[in-house]
Amino acid sequence: QKVSVEFDDNRMENLFILPDLPDTAIPMGANVTYFGPGVHNAGVIRIANESGRILYLDEGAVVLGRIEAENAANLTIRGRGVFCSSQEDHGAGRRPQMEFRNCDNLKIEGILLRDTPNWTLKIVGSTGVHIDNIKEIGWIMNSDGMDFICCRDVLVENTFQRNYDDNVTIKAFNATPEYIASHTNTDGSYSDGAIWMVAGLRDFEVCNYEIRNCVFWADKAHNMLVGPEARGIAFRNIRFHDNIVLENRQDDGIYPGAMAVM
């Protein structure tokens, strides 16, 4: 069980109790980056053009930094430790806590993510994503829990997410040749700035999502959101089920509620 305890109706300084079973399958090998108990100032961890990399955060580990991964296959980030971005820029230059682009067979499991400067998990153009039993605590505007952009074959399960902004968002940006041609200004700039985020992707399809057995708490925005910032790309086979919404203070007059399809 994952529990929030609030004293005297104070929902901003509540106590989280997030127990876990011990992890008895600690990985070993040359492909493993191991963070043991204690504080680790990792800075920016960059992973590119690799296969089979494992980042393991053991119980008692607090890793300070953020992650950027691109063109990685079979990447795993797991353990019982904490990944914290409290030392990162939370001002004008703030970046997501973890960014993944063109990463196939990505797994994130067991860890606690806290104090993201921006989106917590930004996953772009990736296939075969499995997120299991992670915990998130984000307090800042734009602290989305998970933003999937043009991803396919995604399973999210057993998470506990308390974020100021949206918890799970499924987006579809567009950078097909036809779309770029119709959104290019005479000076060569793009009228749709989101093109830069997905330019060069192999595929823009958005399909096959299952989000199940999760606990959501959004302070300001939606807990579950499908379709914001869509650019002419179809959404197919997306399923949310058996999830719990602890808190929903979303106040959008056009798309209100714990979940919205926009």
Locate each region found by the language model.
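Glycine-centered low-complexity coil/loop motifs and glycine-rich tracts
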Residues: P228-A234
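Beta-strand-enriched, solvent-exposed domains that form extended recognition/catalytic surfaces
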Residues: Q1-M28
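Short hydrophobic beta-strand that contains or immediately precedes a catalytic carboxylate
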Residues: Y34-F35, Y56-L57, I67
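Extracellular beta-strand-rich solenoid/capping regions of secreted or surface-exposed proteins
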Residues: Q1, H40-I54, V62-R78, S85-K107, ...
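Structural detector of coil-to-beta-strand junctions
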Residues: R66, Q97, T120, S143-G145, ...
